[in-house]
Each structure stands twice: as C-alpha cells, then as structure tokens.
C-alpha cells in the first residue's frame, strides 16, 4: 500500500518537473503582425495606419532582440508600394530576402512587377 502511494507521488513529481522544464523561445516574434494582416484583408484601416502599426511592432521586436516572422517585411513592402513609397518598398523586400532566402524568387517577382508598373505609369 505504501509502495503504491510512494510510486504515485514520484510519478506526480516527475510529471510536474517535466512540465516545469524551461521552454525554448519562439523562433519568430509575431508581435502585432497577424492582426494587421487581418485588418488589411478586412479593409478596416488605411495603408498608412498599417505601416505605422507594423513599423512600431518591428521596433518592439528588434528591441527584444527577436526576429520578425516570414512575410513581415514583404507585407510592409507591399503597403509601401501601395502608397507610392518605392524606396521603402524596395528596402522592405530586400530585408525579407536577407532574412528568408527562400523568399528570394517571390521578392524578385514583386520588385520586377513594381519596376514594370513604374515604367508603364511614366509612359
């Protein structure tokens, strides 16, 4: 009887100790990104308001020494391109390529598309 209680107590202690083990920090900091993407698709905020919110979130992410999630800079670049701030859009696309090399083909496509639309607009 005492042995059963002792084993139960040891099992409970091991279970609780396993739950209390330090967890690994998340790979990316999603600070405000997902709500902004949702707002973008719902059309509830202007592009400039979204840019301001994402820039603020990016500063917070960097202040904590974390990395923004995949697509963060791409979304920011598309917002900049949408309001005509081409240089900032280019910088955001380049930042996305640098952080996530697997996005290079898509970022190149967006930059090429942006360049082509600028040439068409000038004609």
Predicted features and spans:
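Flexible helix-coil transition and linker loops at the boundaries of alpha-helical arrays
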Residues: 20-26, 58-66
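Structural register within alpha-helical repeat arrays
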Residues: 75-76
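Bacterial Sec signal peptide processing site at the extreme N-terminus
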Residues: 13-36
């Amino acid at each position: 009887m005492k042995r059963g209680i002792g084993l139960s107590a040891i099992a409970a202690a091991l279970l609780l100790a396993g739950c209390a083990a330090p967890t690994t920090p998340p790979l990316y900091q999603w600070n405000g990104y997902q709500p902004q993407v949702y707002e973008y698709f719902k059309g509830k905020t202007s592009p400039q308001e979204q840019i301001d919110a994402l820039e603020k979130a990016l500063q917070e992410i960097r202040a904590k020494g974390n990395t923004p999630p995949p697509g963060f800079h791409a979304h920011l670049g598309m917002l900049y391109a949408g309001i005509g701030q081409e240089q900032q859009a280019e910088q955001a696309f380049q930042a996305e390529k640098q952080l996530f090399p697997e996005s290079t083909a898509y970022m190149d496509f967006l930059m090429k598309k942006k360049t082509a639309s600028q040439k068409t607009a000038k004609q």
